[in-house]
């Protein structure tokens, strides 16, 4: 018997200590005051786990159960409080009224309590939106200037009728083609005037048969070569032969030789 008592003491001393939770019922008044949703109960370990623990320890296992009553203070089992987020969310509406006076004071027409002498805001005239075509026409169009009339001075000299001077310098220079055609027509007029006139020894002009008509242009384009041939001065003909007293010797001799 003594040995059995010693064995029971040894086994009790070697077994680990397990905490035991004592559950007490809550009073009826507390339950009505704080009607909060009950937290889900802690899941109990499976029966296989309890059987293994019973075999090892050979003692009763008591599973702690969280009480349903919550104290006013913070509970270690409760989730983290959401007070910082609520404060952070509620901060913008509290800070907004403080920001609105600044925005109002920054407006040009508003005057804050610190602005004792508000300065007038300069008004800028709106610029008319003009298109590119309108601006281009304004640049290209010249503004009409008022004609400046000369002052009338008393003239003591008798009035003389003003003769308009021939305007020569204002005429544009004639082109080369027009000058060639003028020369051709002039030659034709000379040929018609000297058609019946006999050619004398002093006359150098000779009517050309080709001047009776205009040169025929084979191509529709302007041919300057044919006009140049017509415009060339006519060759001079000497109908009377000049007889010299001593005929010219056309025989040539080399230098250093004499004819005997």
Swiss-Prot record:
Annotated segments matching region Disordered: 29-132
Pro residues bias locations: 73-83
GO BP, sorted A to Z: response to wounding
Domain of life (superkingdom): Eukaryota
A Pfam match: DUF4643
Name of this protein: Proline-rich protein 33
Source species: Mus musculus (Mouse)
Gene: Prr33
